[in-house]
C-alpha cells in the first residue's frame, strides 16, 4: 500500500485553498464592482430625472430588518385596525408618500393620485406583479393576475370578449340568481346577509365563467358544496401566505392546504374537460356550431376553449377570475347594505327611484338610469373598497413624480426591486380630495364629483378591472330588486364596521339585519 507523503497532502490542500480563496476574492470583487457601477448609474439616473431624497421616512428602531415595523403591522392586523392605522397614523403623521427602508429593501407607501397614476399607467411597463406568483401559482397554475408582459397581454385579450357590453347587458342569468337570493331572505328575522351574498356571487360567478352554476343558494350538489368550502379556505390561506411574506419558508408541511387547492382545481377541470371534448368534436365535424349545445350566456370557458389555448391555461384563467370576482362583489354589496340598514333615509330615496319600474326584469339601460343607486355604490366603494390596498414591484430603476424635496413635490427615485404600495382605503378618505365630511357616507357628493385617479376601487390603467361594469350592474340589479321587495332594512348589530382583510375586505362581524315588506 502506497503511503502519500504529508508534504504532498499539504501542497494539495494548499492548492485547494488557494483556488477557493481566489474564487472568493473574484466573487467579492465582482459584487463590489457591480455595486459601485450600480451606485454610479443610479446617481446619474437621479440627476437626469431631477430626483430628490424622499421627504418622509418612517423611523424604525430596527433599520436592518424592520422587526418593530413588522410586529406593529401584525398587532394592528390582529386587532383589525390595519387600514385605520395606515389612514390615521402613518399617512397623516408621516406623509402621503413615505419610505420604509429595511436594510437594502425599500418600500414606498403612497396615497398621492399622481404617483399611483404613474405606477398604473404612465410607467406601466416599469412595474409588475412577479411577487404574486409564489402565492397564486399553487392554486391557479398561472393566469392573468400573476403574469406580466406579452403573457399578460395575451390573457387580457382572451378575457375581454366575456366582459364586453353585450355580455354584461344580458341580465337574464344574473336576475335568475337574484330571484333565488330574494327567496332566501326571511322577513322580520335577524340573519347574516353577508353569508347569502357570498353564496349568491358564487352562483352567478360560476355560471358566468363556467356556463354552469354551483347553485349554492337553492340546490347545491355535494361536489359544489365541497368546492365552495375549499374555495373559501383557499382565499383565506392565500391571504395568510401573503401576510407571512419571507417567513413562508419556515412553515411546516403544507400538504393539507395543497390538498384543498387540488379540490378547487379538480372541480374546475371537470368543466374544462367537457369544453375541450366539445371543441374536439367540433373540429372533427361530429358537432357543428349550429347544433352545438346553446346557453343563453356565452361563458368564459366556452370562449377560451374555442380560442385553442391549452387545458392548463383555461383552468388557470377561470380560477384567477373567480378568485378576483367572488368576494369583490359580495363585499361590495355587504358593505353597502351594512350602511343602508343604518340609514333609512337613504333606503327611502332608493325605493323612490326604483318605484317607477313596473318590472322585476329590467333592461340594462333601465339599470344605468338608477342614478342615486349608483351614487350609493360609489360611496360604498369609496369608504369601504373591497380591495383596500395594492402594490407593484419596480422591474427597473424608475421614478415617481412626487415625494421628494423639502415640500414633497420633487420626483423620487424608485430603485429596481423596490415595492410601491398604495392604500386606496386611505386615499378615499383624504379630506383635501373629498371635503371635510370625507369620513361620512353621503351619496349626494357624487352629483358634482367626477371620479379621477383619486377614486380607484377597480384599479386603473391597462390593468383596470375587466369586470368593473359587470360588478356594478350586478349590484344595481340586487339593489333594485331588494328595493322593490322590501320596505325597510333594520340593522340588528350595533357594532361599528370593522375590517376583515383577506384577499378582499368586508365587515368582520358580518351584516346582521332584518328585512320588512308590505303584507
Swiss-Prot record:
**What GO molecular function annotations does the UniProt record carry, in alphabetical order?**
heme binding; iron ion binding; oxidoreductase activity, acting on paired donors, with incorporation or reduction of molecular oxygen, reduced flavin or flavoprotein as one donor, and incorporation of one atom of oxygen
- Superkingdom to which the source organism belongs: Eukaryota
State which residue ranges cross the membrane.
12-34
Entry's Pfam families? p450
Pathway stated in the Swiss-Prot or TrEMBL entry = Secondary metabolite biosynthesis
Instruction: State the GO CC annotations.
Output: membrane
Q: How does it sit in the membrane?
A: Single-pass membrane protein
> What is the recorded function of this protein according to its Swiss-Prot or TrEMBL entry?
Cytochrome P450 monooxygenase; part of the gene cluster that mediates the biosynthesis of the gamma-pyrones fusapyrone (FPY) and deoxyfusapyrone (dFPY). FPY is an undecaketide and thus likely synthesized by the polyketide synthase FPY1 from acetyl-CoA functioning as starter unit and the addition of 10 malonyl-CoA extender units by successive Claisen-condensations.
Protein's name in the database: Cytochrome P450 monooxygenase FPY7
